């Protein structure tokens, strides 16, 4: 089916629609979204198919923060009807300031968790976490590269 989105008219199959039973904080009235990839880029757009003006850039958090960790509560697992950890997809929302892409931040505190089997999704706000909603992507990548260098040096 063709949907009007912030990215233009896009053909989205019903089986590709993500269902947020509670919406997303700030957009609780919106329940149906689709992931629109950007060719040759790790960033995708989490696009509302109910409001053509809502699209959020998202990325796999481990591409930015190699030691990222997430613990799902029993309630989260039940809400998303997760049966197997291999059926889970995790994405983090990016904030890209207009005209200043070098100041892009990533929300590591509240990732989007997707059950890849049934397409249920939820933004999880981690409790008792050292993460925040705004980590500078540039800094996290540099920190991750430093961790990689240390692990290579230590294993030689």
From Swiss-Prot:
The gene is fliW. One of its GO terms (cellular component) is cytoplasm. NCBIfam families: PRK13285.1-1. Pfam families: FliW. Keywords: Bacterial flagellum biogenesis, Chaperone, Cytoplasm, Translation regulation. Belongs to the FliW family. The keyword Glycosyltransferase does not apply. Its main location: cytoplasm. Acts as an anti-CsrA protein, binds CsrA and prevents it from repressing translation of its target genes, one of which is flagellin. Binds to flagellin and participates in the assembly of the flagellum. It comes from the Bacteria. One of its GO terms (biological process) is bacterial-type flagellum assembly. PANTHER family: FLAGELLAR ASSEMBLY FACTOR FLIW (PTHR39190:SF1). InterPro entries: Flagellar_assembly_factor_FliW, Flagellar_assmbl_FliW_dom_sf. It is found in: Cytoplasm. This is Flagellar assembly factor FliW. Interacts with translational regulator CsrA and flagellin(s).
């Amino acid at each position: 089916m063709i949907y009007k989105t912030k990215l233009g008219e896009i053909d989205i199959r019903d089986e590709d629609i993500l269902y947020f039973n509670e919406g997303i904080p700030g957009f609780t009235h919106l329940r149906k979204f689709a992931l629109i990839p950007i060719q040759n880029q790790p960033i995708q757009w989490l696009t509302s198919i109910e409001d053509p003006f809502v699209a959020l850039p998202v990325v796999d958090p481990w591409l930015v923060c190699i030691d990222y960790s997430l613990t799902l509560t029993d309630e989260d697992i039940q809400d998303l009807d997760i049966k197997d950890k291999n059926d889970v997809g995790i994405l983090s929302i990016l904030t890209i300031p207009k005209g200043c892409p070098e100041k892009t931040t990533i929300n590591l505190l509240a990732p989007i968790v997707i059950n890849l089997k049934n397409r249920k999704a939820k933004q999880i706000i981690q409790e008792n976490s050292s993460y925040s909603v705004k980590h500078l992507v540039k800094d996290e990548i540099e920190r991750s590269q430093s961790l990689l260098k240390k692990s290579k040096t230590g294993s030689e």
